[in-house]
């Protein structure tokens, strides 16, 4: 017997599940289903986004609802007063191939004429403004450590708009590397040392897990649900947290601690690999 699933928006885990023989996706988009209100509810509902009327019906009628953070789980429990056992948290899945890591780094440093002992601080996001690009540049401007470069990557539109703001950051003029529409964004995580995301957004920033998986030290505003996977040292009290520049200086000056945190982050992020998340999901549905 197949387990049925439904979702608002797809993700890596859902796309993998679609290929399993024991999984069937329920769709209620057909004309006649809407006309006769012949709606089916899935065994498992993947919730994302706002808790609207449609989502509430799916949650109440499913056997299990999957969310990507405890913050969302707690909000659902508070508003709907349903059993905690019916809401399961599976953090976003990571599916990155880190083979040839050294070659990728060497090629990148050569391409952009970077000394091999230079540290790289990375920023990327779908929406630069709400993800804290201004705060990112302000923090980097306040660093005392000097031997670093900044990678800022996005689409052509975002990079083009950003260039109008850069003249005010004279101190960073020789340090900024702008990259638009890079062929493989995952490689930018692999070559970087620090991923700094002073975001204003609440929705789980999957890039934090990607960065951790790729052995970056991460810093993140606690406004974001991804705060659940980082420790106190990596947490920013707000996107404008003035202590972060001191923390970055300290970690860049301590090579041993830098490497230690990178390895710890990689170990933690591996728990969210697509293989581990598939295993966890299949264990959950075996109890339905």
Question: Where are each of the predicted segments found?
Answer:
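Conserved acidic donor-binding segment of nucleotide-sugar-dependent glycosyltransferases
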Residues: 232-242, 250-255
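Nucleotide-activated donor-binding/catalytic signature segment of Leloir-type glycosyltransferases, i.e.
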Residues: 163-181
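Aromatic "clamp/platform" in nucleotide-sugar-dependent glycosyltransferases that forms part
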Residues: 200
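Short hydrophobic beta-strand element within catalytic cores of glycosyltransferases
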Residues: 217-220
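Acidic anion/phosphate-binding donor-loop and adjacent secondary structure
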Residues: 78, 93-110
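Glycosyltransferase donor-sugar binding loop
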Residues: 124, 149-162
